[in-house]
Amino acid sequence: MAPKGLDDFEVTMKKIAILSLAPIAVLVAWCSGSVLHAQTANEAWQMFLNGGQPDLQPNRIRVQYDEPTDPQLRTVYEIMMRRKPLHKVQEIFSPLRLPIDLTVKTTQCGMSNAWYRRPEVTLCYEYLRELRDMAPTETSPDGVTPVDAVVGEFLFTASHEVGHAVFDLLDVPLFGRPEDDADQFAAHVLIRIGKNNAPQLIHGAAYMYAEYIKRPTVTVPVAAFADVHGAPVQRLYNLLCLAYGADPVMFADVVEKGYLPKSRVPACKTEWGEVDFAFQKLIYPYIDRTLLNEVLSKSWVPYAKIPIRRQTDAPQSQSMR
């Protein structure tokens, strides 16, 4: 048995040796590229212990409701605080196993927009106000309720931005435009998070593009075709095509009512198959199946009414994310 003093000396030397490895761990993680996922030195150290791989965990979505300074955004902020829709987003994406926490927040931006910038997804109050004002004041002739329109478009936009985050944080390879891939990610989420909700969510999201369906031609500046997003009418047809391809029976009305041109219909099953295959191969390995089953068992469309402005009070701007 070694003298007590020698034991203490050995313990101290071991601690020094371990601590001296921390900078090396950070350097190794940096050289391997995995430090890009680390927010702190502790996370970089954990990556080193995991062989350079990030510590993937579910339940890493955080939410934040920033209080706006603009009095005109106060009503939207109060609605968000009462309804807590970001908590729904948090729950829907809780099965994702991510290397770091991802914060989804609402805030005042000075413009109507939404975006992802690591480690945050930002949804602007100006956009949410516009979304509220664009919704129908009553159930539309096509059966879209104000709740369907608001919830469907809100979840589509939130899912689109979370899609950008997933591609970034999990190093998901893209073989196309990031905005198109984020749209496909969002469409897959809305179609898959519950068959009872899928028609309401898809039709609600599609409602926001309805004005483009009614116009046979739309005049836009040539520079608009250089935008990173597809044209709104293209995004609409892509969304409807994926929905129809996923379930031709459930979404038969998108063809029967002429929302989706019949010339596009034959390709929809293949298009959905490609998106679903990519999701299975690239996203599902990072999903906690137990939590996913809990998400799939729930309803995500509320029955409560959402305060809607009178149609005459709605602003003219109808930009889409």
Segments the model singles out, each with a brief description of its role:
Residues 46-61, 221-321:
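Pan-zinc metallopeptidase signature
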Residues 105-122, 127-136:
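Catalytic zinc-binding patch centered on the HExxH motif and its immediate surroundings
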Residues 123, 156-171, 183, 187:
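Active-site recognition of the HExxH zinc-binding catalytic motif
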Residues 76-101, 131:
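Zn2+-dependent metallopeptidase catalytic core
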Residues 134-156, 171-174:
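Short pre-active-site segment immediately N-terminal to the catalytic Zn-binding motif
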Residues 69, 75, 169-185:
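Active-site metal-coordination segments of metallo-dependent hydrolases
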